[in-house]
């Protein structure tokens, strides 16, 4: 047991020495700072897109079925492109977590940001996407879009209002999770700034 603790301490000392050497000349610190800014930007874009949907909720609840379905179809070109920022944010957070020394507050806040963003993305695939399949079933879309919307297709039944409520609630949940991710990575960035 003591031997394990000693080896663990040696590993931590070696790990910190590796990071210290990386930051010694300043170029590592500047690279890490630039990567942190890119990561913050990707997470902020993800949060902004989710928040945009959530903020439309009061107005969209007043729409009749035909108008609501028409409005749904206008989102997909822009928000599909914006989805790449979401994937980029998850990848960037994972890389940032790998590069962040453990243990430490910055590590835990970065981990929290990653967990929240992965949960936000999972909400899309498990809740939002199946309802998107329903909204898009009668809409003419490109072949790549048709392939995308056919993924995880489930038979949706019920009143359109029930599906609308699920879709809208999923976007409120996504906005909340993305906001928590953005707050977490921002806090992690303040620990990075304070380590100079």
Regions found by a protein language model. Give the residues of each.
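Basic polycationic patches enriched in arginine
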Residues: 3-4, 8-12, 29
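Short hydrophobic alpha-helical segments enriched in small aliphatic residues
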Residues: 7, 17-20
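Membrane-interfacial loop-to-transmembrane-helix junctions in polytopic alpha-helical membrane proteins
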Residues: 27-34, 71-81, 102-109, 156, ...
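Interfacial segments of alpha-helical transmembrane regions
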Residues: 31-44, 95-121
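Interfacial loop at the N-terminal end of multi-pass membrane proteins
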Residues: 43-90, 132-164
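Core segments of transmembrane alpha-helices
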Residues: 85-95, 175-182
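Hydrophobic alpha-helical transmembrane segments of integral membrane proteins
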Residues: 114-135
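Juxtamembrane boundary at the C-terminal end of a transmembrane helix
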Residues: 189-196
